Structures are given as structure tokens and as C-alpha cells.
């Protein structure tokens, strides 16, 4: 019991000197001839009561009264505070790390907690220091600032129902926006066409010659480039194809050109669409033309080649050659 409660650094020499003083009894009190049974009459040196031992409040002994607990060495309070409290620069670095990162670092907290002990003073200091660090971090942490709003007004948002009413309402016209460049090009083309028409009208007014074809006025400019063509036998102006005649190529209409090629073109022949056609003198049938020629022969009027040519080419015919 004694060995377990004393520390190892206790001065044993002084302890045994005190024992010698206690053992120094006067000689008159001791009987020379005492037996074994008289041993109970001697006063006991060691007391079994714990009250004679130093109290728990003695600074040489620890505050733990359990017999099973290990012996503890007394250390002054100032030394404990120095060991428990880390240097100031360590705390500053920890606070800076917390300010830089929004989440607390577990490694720094573990390294900071290894300096702590189980004393109540250290627990109070640790709680106060942790509260100070949390207050500082809560003040220093920057907030998430959003982007500043611009002063430009936003366009008004139209409702979908209003848009549908405007598009699908009573007035179903759709407004199409045309780019300005396209409009400018279109206006330029219109101006060019107007200038060309003005030039043509000025040239026609300067010449002063107008022709009427089917009730339409034709400028002299167009009549000079494209003259009106007529068939030299029947004076037809419209035909699907112009053919070769006695006056050159493209001088006869299609019907007269076919008969001229086969040698059956006579003065009595006229197409039904010819403006010079008279039923008493002309016909578009080859049989009737042959009968008419036979009557003339029987009457004594002989038909010569000159008469054929005069019948072939009218005097008032307009000759147009490309």
C-alpha cells in the first residue's frame, strides 16, 4: 500500500531517519525477560488507518483516491498551461486556413487537439478558443455576391394568349419583316426599269411615227427592228412556218410554200385565211383551181407565165426580207 501510493522520486533517506527516531524508545520501559506472547503490549508503529496519511488536498499527492489507479506526478499549473496551449503562430495559421477554405480541415483539427489534456482548465480554454475561432471565421467569411444588375430596361414579356389572338384573330394577316438591304435592292431594280421605259418613250416621241397592229400602238423603234412580214402570194401575216418562194427564202407562208415546192401554186389559189380571198376568183382546193383554169382556156384567154407571176406577186404587197 505504501509503495504503491508514493512516487518514485521520493527521498528515501529522510524517511528512514524518521523511522529511527520513532524506534528510539527509553530503556526503562522495556522488560528484559519478555516472551513471545507479550508482543501485543508494544505500541504499533504503523497505523492501518488512512487518516494518518496525507490528505488528498496535499500537493504532493494526486486527487485520485482509487487504489487501482496509477500514480501521477504533480506538475505546476503554469507548466500545464504552457504545454496545453499551442504557440500563437499555430493558431493564426489554423484561422487563416479556415478563412481560405469554407469547409474545416480535419487534419488541422486533429493536430490541434493532440496538445489537449484531460484537465478541466484545458477543456475550458479549448472551448473558449474554439468559440473565438468560430466567431472570427463567421465574420471573415466572404458572402457569395451575384452579378450586378444592368440599368438597361428589359423588353416587356408578351403573354402567349395575346400573341395567339393577334395571329389567329379576325385579321389573319401575318406581318413579315423584310431586311432593309433586300428592299433597297428591289427599289434599285424598279428605278432601272423606269429609266429604260423613259428612254424608249423619248426615242419614240422624237421619231413621231406610230403604227397600229390589231388595235395596239407599236413604236417605230420596234417596227424598224422587227418589220411586219406578209406572204407574197396571199398576204397572210400569221403562219406556223415561213417557206422558200420565187423571191427568196421565207417569203411565202406555209400553205403557199408547200404548193410552190410541188409546182401547184397558181394565181387562183388562196388560203381561206387570206385577206385577198374572193370565192368567185379564188379557191383553196386544187380541183376547183384546175376547173377554173380549164374554163379560162375554153374561153380563149390563155394564161401565160407573166400572168402567173402577176397573180403570184400582188402590187400592194409589203416585201420584208431578213
Swiss-Prot record:
Main localization, broad class: nucleus
Annotated segments matching region Disordered: 93-168
Subcellular location: Nucleus
Sequence motif Nuclear localization signal, location on chain: 147-154
UniProtKB keywords: Activator, DNA-binding, Metal-binding, Nucleus, Transcription, Transcription regulation, Zinc, Zinc-finger
This protein's record includes keyword Hydrolase: no
Gene Ontology terms describing biological process: circadian rhythm; positive regulation of DNA-templated transcription; seed germination
Low complexity composition-biased segments: 102-141
SUPFAM superfamilies assigned: Glucocorticoid receptor-like (DNA-binding domain)
GO molecular function: DNA-binding transcription factor activity; transcription cis-regulatory region binding; zinc ion binding
Cellular component, GO annotation: nucleus
Zinc fingers (GATA-type) by residue: 225-279
Bias-annotated ranges (Basic residues): 144-154
InterPro entries reported in the protein's UniProt record: GATA_TF, TF_GATA_pln, Znf_GATA, Znf_NHR/GATA
Pfam families xrefs: GATA
Record-stated family: Belongs to the type IV zinc-finger family. Class A subfamily.
The protein's role, per its UniProt record: Transcriptional activator that specifically binds 5'-GATA-3' or 5'-GAT-3' motifs within gene promoters. May be involved in the regulation of some light-responsive genes.
The protein's name: GATA transcription factor 8
Species per Swiss-Prot/TrEMBL record: Arabidopsis thaliana (Mouse-ear cress)
Lineage per the UniProt record: Eukaryota, Viridiplantae, Streptophyta, Embryophyta, Tracheophyta
Gene designation: GATA8
